[in-house]
């Protein structure tokens, strides 16, 4: 496979692997090497694998086109590079497909979403290798299929939004600048700005005049040096006046002429130097005057700002005082009244619930009182009957009085007096001291009871058993 860019053996093997022959099952190349591709944006549509196509079908139009390329297009546009070209198919059918796809793309440049995968890969490569450029329109990825109408609407909408945002930003900047100018005009800072620029101008003028004075001083020094040199040479010639020659006479004449010229130059340069020094002094005094004016205006402006800030602080304090007085005289009584009303409503609702519950408790107490009265009456009747029975049987003096009570009346009596138990009698606890300072749920262990005695006995037995086991182990050891 002959290409414009030569292959290495490894690249040839890879190309043969990824470019199957037309007789194989798959005719679509899986991978396109970067050296055998077609450029998308080039109207000449130059293929790098021209020799292979021409050798396969020498009578095809593509082979003729490749055999005789357009000199204008080939001269105006460079050859394809490995980064901005598409894959080139290896058969004539593939070439025709690529040609049709390229012609469709040239006809419809906007419909890039319906292009082939090879074109999308080329777009991705060109976008990666191209330099970063901020676009003013919104561009969708190429792998998303969007109808052309929707894409056009999106592009138009993005352009409108971008233009509107730019317009808003520009207007905001203009308004901020105008607001700053108005504030400066109100506070008198424009005069300070004018004097500041005047100070800069005076400084530049002073620098320029100083440079001019230095130049005049250099010219004056040069003229003085030339005059001194001419006078020195004249004095040397006058010392040997008796031995002058024609050359010495002409030299003396030129020296007198140069001395006269240098004297005039010294006079003119001295005047220019004096004028330059006077201008420098005048400019310096003007600069000092402008600096003093600027300082004065800045002091006046700072005094205005300070007075404005003072009055603003006073106004803020007055507003805060008014708000405080209003809160104390108006808001707080209203809040207090509202709080009292809510509290009264809650208390009334709570009292209603309490009254309802008290009515239920009163009914329950009435039922308990009736039950206790009936139980006491039954107890009196049975006690009278027991006394009568004891009188009738004096020999059975140790009998339990509850034996004469019927089993049906014992629960009623136990409900009134819990100490009554028909089955067995309770004995007094062994420990009668109450331990204080513990919560209510520890009453069985704190108050004297048989349960506490049993618990203490169990704990004592456990301690005794532990001591006994320890003693046995100690003896065995």
Curated annotation (Swiss-Prot):
Residues 190-233 form a coiled coil. InterPro entries: MDM33_fungi (IPR008839). Pfam families: She9_MDM33 (PF05546). The keyword Amino-acid biosynthesis does not apply. GO terms for biological process: inner mitochondrial membrane organization. One of its GO terms (cellular component) is mitochondrial inner membrane. It is a multi-pass membrane protein. This is Sensitive to high expression protein 9 homolog, mitochondrial. PANTHER family: SENSITIVE TO HIGH EXPRESSION PROTEIN 9, MITOCHONDRIAL. Keywords: Coiled coil, Membrane, Mitochondrion, Mitochondrion inner membrane, Transit peptide, Transmembrane, Transmembrane helix. Residues 49-128 are annotated as: Disordered. It is found in: Mitochondrion inner membrane. Belongs to the SHE9 family. Residues 332-454 are mitochondrial intermembrane. Homooligomer. The chain crosses the membrane at residues 311-331, 455-475. Residues 111-128 have a biased composition (Low complexity). It comes from the Eukaryota. Residues 476-477 are mitochondrial matrix. Required for the maintenance of the structure of the mitochondrial inner membrane. Involved in mitochondrial morphology. Causes growth arrest when highly overexpressed. The keyword Glycosyltransferase does not apply.
